Design a protein with these regions (language model features):
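Receiver (REC) domain active-site loop signature in two-component systems and cognate sites
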Residues: 64
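C-terminal output helix
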Residues: 115-124
Length: 134
């Protein structure tokens, strides 16, 4: 459990089709951030796990074989019980116009790959604080 002011952020649901990214990110978020993290290898699995895991924040890769990150984001926003959950994209996109397009979708943050996994918890905290007026 990670306390952020009076807000407690506990659960992060993370989807990426790269096993190494999943493992490194999970370890960093659990050990550095103190979060409970559930990982899955596809967008469809993430959507299936939403109800049972009830995450406080979702991190999703932009390009996965079954669903793109934006498709996952749109589906989360269509569900009233989850439409306020902050979503962070992970992406290998490096062209500025594509990056701006991703940011314009309404996600909380976009993190470029490759990234330093130790900074992931910090970015998650900043997103969480920003969504709660801190």
């Amino acid at each position: 459990v990670k306390a952020v002011g009076a807000i407690t952020l506990q659960r992060i649901l993370l989807a990426d089709d790269e096993p190494d990214i999943l493992e490194i990110s999970r370890i960093a978020l659990e050990t550095v951030g103190g979060f409970e993290v559930s990982v899955c290898s596809s967008g469809k699995k993430l959507l299936e796990r939403l109800v049972e895991f009830e995450p406080d924040l979702v991190i999703v890769d932009v390009l996965m074989p079954d669903m793109t990150g934006p498709e996952v984001f749109e589906e989360i926003r269509r569900r009233p019980e989850f439409d306020a959950i902050p979503v962070i994209y992970l992406t290998g996109v490096i062209q500025e116009e594509e990056l701006e397009g991703l940011r314009d979708t309404g996600v909380a943050d976009v993190i470029l790959k490759p990234f330093d996994p130790m900074t992931l918890a910090d970015r998650v905290n900043r997103v969480w604080e920003g969504n709660h007026g801190r």
